[in-house]
Amino acid sequence: MNEHRLTAIPLILAFVSFAIGATLPVVGEKGNIRIFTLSVREHLLAVADNAAVWRWANIFMGAAAVLLLVGLTMLTTILEGAGERVLSRLGLVGVLLAVVLWVVFSAHRAVITVMAAQETVGTGTVPPYYEPLAQWGFALFYVYAVVAFLALAAYGGSLLQVGLLPAWVGWGTIIFSIAMLVLLLITGDTLPAFHYFPPLLIGILLLLRG
């Protein structure tokens, strides 16, 4: 198996792992399709009602970020070998920072949120420590999202310079990432799944062309 196909595997698996993690809390007998958008108290009650699944969901989503880092590290090696070292390395630094932030955020949701959820069920009120920590967690998420979109745009520019894939892939990655970044800056929120779409496309094309 050549390096293109090897690189494709973690990029595709990252999307699969994230999709599993994002789907777990919203399906099944105790699933809640609105669990990610509920008010604080209702969110904690929903988590408490499905705590084990919530933990596994965040494990899968944390693993997805690590797989993404592995895949993009391998892609960076290919891009450097093709002579493009600036944008690919900037992209990798950005992804590394974003993944660290996301893993911390996922751990926060898997541990602190579950603990607060159990206390909410026991006392009937949201623990006073939780909302400040939730705001801190969202700040982590926001920085993660901004950095990740910028990193993906850098990879799009790098792809354009080396011709590893058709030019539309590079342009599509840049345009999609910048558009989602602008939407984030306007609305203040985004779906983390958006960070996995360009790498999924890149992974599929590398697999097909490998």
Where does each model-flagged region fall?
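Hydrophobic, aromatic-enriched alpha-helical segments typical of multi-pass transmembrane helices
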Residues: 1-210
